[in-house]
């Protein structure tokens, strides 16, 4: 029997953290963060990490599990999340994944199992490389590789290219999980306004001090490349004004939100929920309860 997993996804600033806590409290669950930046200690504000009060309201995993000097990959996330899901289930609780890093979540929950003769990190690195390509470039690669993909589905093309590259060492089997994807969204302008307001709140909460520490201590770290940090480095070097740096954070965050929505829409079988819609919480509760009772 497959393990049922609730997955709360969506663009930045849409309200994933609050919903995840609500569902964990309501359905006896524990939260696994599906965010590539929230693993880092001391990076709290720019990563929009759940506050100490929020983390006290529900058990959270994969937050503050790496120093900023360490790297973090999809392979590490998959290995650690699998162990956590098994542990949470063994204690009679519901695993709830909350986050916006689509590659990590898809790598965990889609039907890929890596055989013992291939480096798992190598496969995930190749997947990330393919994901950076446009639909047109992927289709060209598929044609050159002699792949016949029904409907030219992006997901199927990537899967086919992986199988072509790694052959029998990559087993194409069903996942051991049964996920319910809850993808939060909102009208674009409303979402963009929320993003802008959140950046302003981050600045008021001390984001610049957090960035300054990172810039002084670990400017070359993988963590420093995240949105909300890298945009301030030119300001700290005297190249742009603080206002320009803040505007760049807002602009990059809006662009990232758009890319996230495109990812979830095109590459994962998700149900969308408009957060500003009346009674949206009731719709989500109904979906979760029907999923758990099935």
Curated annotation (Swiss-Prot):
Residues carrying the site annotation Interaction with substrate tRNA: 101, 127
Cofactor(s) needed for function: Mg(2+)
Residue numbers binding substrate: 12-17
Reactions it catalyzes: adenosine(37) in tRNA + dimethylallyl diphosphate = N(6)-dimethylallyladenosine(37) in tRNA + diphosphate
Recorded GO MF terms: ATP binding; tRNA dimethylallyltransferase activity
This enzyme's EC code(s): 2.5.1.75
Binding site for ATP: 10-17
Nucleotide-binding among keywords: yes
Gene Ontology annotations of biological process type: tRNA modification
Region of interest (Interaction with substrate tRNA), residue spans: 35-38
InterPro entries, per database record: Dimethylallyltransferase (IPR039657), IPT (IPR018022), P-loop_NTPase (IPR027417)
Key words, A-Z: ATP-binding, Magnesium, Nucleotide-binding, Transferase, tRNA processing
SUPFAM superfamilies according to UniProt: P-loop containing nucleoside triphosphate hydrolases
HAMAP family: IPP_trans
PANTHER family linked to this entry: TRNA DIMETHYLALLYLTRANSFERASE
Family statement: Belongs to the IPP transferase family.
Function of the protein: Catalyzes the transfer of a dimethylallyl group onto the adenine at position 37 in tRNAs that read codons beginning with uridine, leading to the formation of N6-(dimethylallyl)adenosine (i(6)A).
Subunit structure, interactors included: Monomer.
The protein's name: tRNA dimethylallyltransferase
Source organism of this protein record: Streptococcus suis (strain 05ZYH33)
């Amino acid at each position: 029997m497959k393990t049922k997993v609730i997955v709360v996804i969506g663009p930045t600033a849409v309200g994933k953290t609050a919903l995840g806590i609500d569902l964990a409290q309501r359905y006896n669950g524990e939260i696994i963060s599906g965010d590539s930046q929230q693993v880092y200690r001391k990076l709290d504000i720019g990563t929009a990490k759940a506050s100490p009060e929020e983390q006290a309201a529900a058990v959270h995993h994969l937050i503050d599990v790496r120093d900023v000097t360490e790297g973090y990959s999809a392979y590490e996330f998959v290995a650690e999340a699998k162990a956590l899901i098994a542990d949470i289930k063994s204690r009679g609780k519901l695993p709830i994944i909350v986050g916006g890093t689509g590659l990590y979540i898809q790598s965990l929950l889609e039907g890929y199992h890596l055989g013992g003769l291939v480096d798992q990190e190598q496969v995930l690195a190749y997947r990330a490389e393919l994901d950076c390509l446009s639909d047109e470039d992927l289709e060209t690669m598929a044609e050159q590789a002699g792949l016949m993909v029904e409907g030219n589905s992006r997901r199927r093309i990537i899967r086919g290219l992986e199988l072509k590259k790694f052959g029998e060492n990559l087993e194409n089997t069903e996942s051991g999980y049964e996920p319910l994807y809850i993808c939060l969204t909102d009208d674009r302008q409303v979402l963009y306004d929320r993003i802008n307001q959140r950046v302003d709140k981050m600045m008021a909460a001390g984001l610049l001090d957090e960035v300054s520490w990172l810039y002084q201590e670990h400017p070359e770290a993988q963590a420093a490349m995240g949105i909300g940090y890298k945009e301030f480095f030119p300001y700290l070097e005297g190249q742009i004004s603080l206002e320009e740096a803040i505007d760049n954070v807002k602009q990059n965050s809006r662009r990232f939100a758009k890319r996230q929505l495109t990812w979830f829409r095109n590459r994962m079988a998700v149900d969308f929920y408009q957060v500003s819609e009346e009674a949206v919480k009731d719709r989500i509760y109904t979906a979760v309860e029907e999923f758990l009772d099935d």
